[in-house]
Amino acid sequence: MSKFWSPFVSGLVPYVPGEQPKLTRLVKLNTNENPYGPSPKAVEAMRAALTDDLRLYPDPNSDLLKHAVAGYYNVQPNQVFLGNGSDEVLAHIFHALFQHDAPLLFPDISYSFYPVYCGLYGIDYEMVALDEQFQIRAEDYARPNAGIIFPNPNAPTGCLLGLDAVEQIIKASPDSVVVVDEAYIDFGGETAITLVDRYPNLLVTQTLSKSRSLAGLRVGLAVGHPDLIEALERVKNSFNSYPLDRMANVGGAAAFEDREHFETTRNKVIESREALVEQLRGKGFDVLPSAANFIFARHPQHDAAALAAKLREQGVIVRHFKQQRIAQFLRISIGTPEQHQALLEGLSDI
C-alpha cells in the first residue's frame, strides 16, 4: 500500500480476467471468444474508416451504431446506451442505478465482476444461492432489494432462465431496476429486450464480443426505458464522452447489418457445442445444460484443478474456478472441431 493511495483502494479486490497467453500454438478454450472471425463487412467498414479523419474525435453519441442496434431490436435510439465493452456499461449501471439503501441482489455463482463493482462503488449486496441444479429460482428474488442483476444464460454455468421466469422477477420488484446481462443470449436463449417497452424498470445488456466475434473491438450496449438510459448517459459524460472510437462505431454497425454471417457462425457454435457435450459425456463427464458458447463440466473421478493443469501441459487451456461450490467444474469455451479434437485427445492421455 502506498501513502499516495486513496484509503478505499487498499480494500479493492480486482477482477481477474482469463489468461491471454503469448504463445499462439496453445489451444485457447478459456475466455469464451468466438472461434470464427467477425463479419467481413465489419472488417471492410473498419478498413474504409482508416483515413485522415482519425485525427478527429469520434461521434460522442455513436449515432450510427446506436441506430443500427435500435433497428435490429425494433426499439428507439433513445432506448439504447453504448459503451467500451459491456464491462464499462455494467460499471456505469452499478454507479448510476444501484447506489441505494437496500442491498443489490445477484446469484452466488455468476459473473465475478459484480462484487468487484460493489466494492468499487460502496454498494451493499446479497448473493442469492442457485439451487442444487445450479439454476436461478425466480421466487428467491421476491424480497426487499435496491436492484437485481443476473447473467442469462448464467456465467459460468451456461444455464438459461426462461423468459417467463425473467418476467416473474421483474414483476416482483417494480420499484427496483432489474438488469438482465445477456452476454451469451444469442447461443440459445430468447432476449428480454422484447420486454423493455412493458417494464420501465428493466435494463438488458449485451456485447459484441461473443456472437459477433468482436471481442478485440470492445463494444457493449444496454437497452431499456429512456429514463434509465438518460442516467447512464449522465454518468458516461461525467467520465468519458468518447468511449467508442471510429473503428468501433462503423465496425459494430456493419456487424449488426450482416445478419447472414451472424446466423451462420452462431449456428456453427451451437452445433459444435452439442457435439462436444455428447463427446465429453461419453468420457464420463457430467455436463450442465448450456445455452452459451461454453460448457460447464466435471468428472466424478478427477480433480478439476488437476485436470486443468494437465491439459495445459498438453497445450490446451480451459478455465478453472476456485469458488467452493464449483471448484470441481471446468468451463470450456466452444472452439473449432480441430480445437475440440485436441481437447479430447488431451483428456484421453490423462
UniProtKB/Swiss-Prot annotation:
Homodimer. Its cofactor is pyridoxal 5'-phosphate. It holds the Pfam family Aminotran_1_2. The gene is hisC. It comes from Pseudomonas syringae pv. tomato (strain ATCC BAA-871 / DC3000). This is Histidinol-phosphate aminotransferase. InterPro entries: Aminotrans_II_pyridoxalP_BS, Aminotransferase_I/II_large, HisP_aminotrans, PyrdxlP-dep_Trfase, PyrdxlP-dep_Trfase_major, PyrdxlP-dep_Trfase_small. It comes from the Bacteria. It is an enzyme of class 2 (transferase). Belongs to the class-II pyridoxal-phosphate-dependent aminotransferase family. Histidinol-phosphate aminotransferase subfamily.
